[in-house]
């Protein structure tokens, strides 16, 4: 739900299993819930089976995220209490598909902290400095259900941690 409009411009990119054209012009997509909606405060449940309905939810979330010019979105933001995140830091780069994270778990974070301004598609127009670890190591399943690990730093680490907060009913304004 990080909202960096300058980073999210119109373009198209495809993933092998979660194919969604990029840009603001999207077909009907789920509404993003905003601050005050009880859905944003409920913890999400683990996804027990990765199947086509999970992939379709990821596609719908990507459409909503691209429409809103965001770079990340969590399922609770569209009213679905499942542990699913979509992230696309560079919507203009067709060579890199969006990242789909199912049941993400933090394995480790760096001791080093960074402060950076964040925004959220669920809290439009509000930007605040948030302190987060500069690096994160996570484990998750991808859209095919494969177990994966990923180390991230910089903006990717921040985006992953921001979106994972949504899975626990935490918003960046709580930080």
Predicted feature residues:
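Positively charged
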Residues: 2-175
């Amino acid at each position: 739900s990080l909202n960096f409009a300058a980073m999210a411009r119109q373009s198209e990119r495809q993933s092998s299993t979660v194919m969604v054209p990029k840009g603001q012009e999207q077909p009907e997509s789920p509404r993003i819930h905003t601050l005050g909606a009880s859905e944003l405060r409920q913890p999400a449940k683990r996804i027990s089976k990765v199947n086509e309905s999970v992939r379709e939810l990821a596609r719908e979330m990507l459409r909503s995220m691209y429409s809103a010019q965001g770079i990340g979105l969590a399922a609770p933001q569209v009213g679905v209490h499942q542990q699913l995140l979509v992230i696309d830091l560079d919507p203009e780069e067709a060579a890199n598909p969006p990242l789909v994270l199912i049941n993400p778990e933090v394995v480790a974070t760096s001791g080093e902290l960074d402060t950076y301004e964040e925004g959220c598609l669920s809290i439009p127009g509000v930007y605040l400095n948030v302190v987060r670890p500069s690096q994160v190591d996570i484990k998750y399943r991808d859209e095919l259900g494969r177990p994966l690990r990923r180390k991230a730093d910089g903006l990717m680490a921040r985006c992953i941690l921001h979106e994972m907060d949504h899975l626990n009913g935490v918003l960046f304004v709580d930080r």
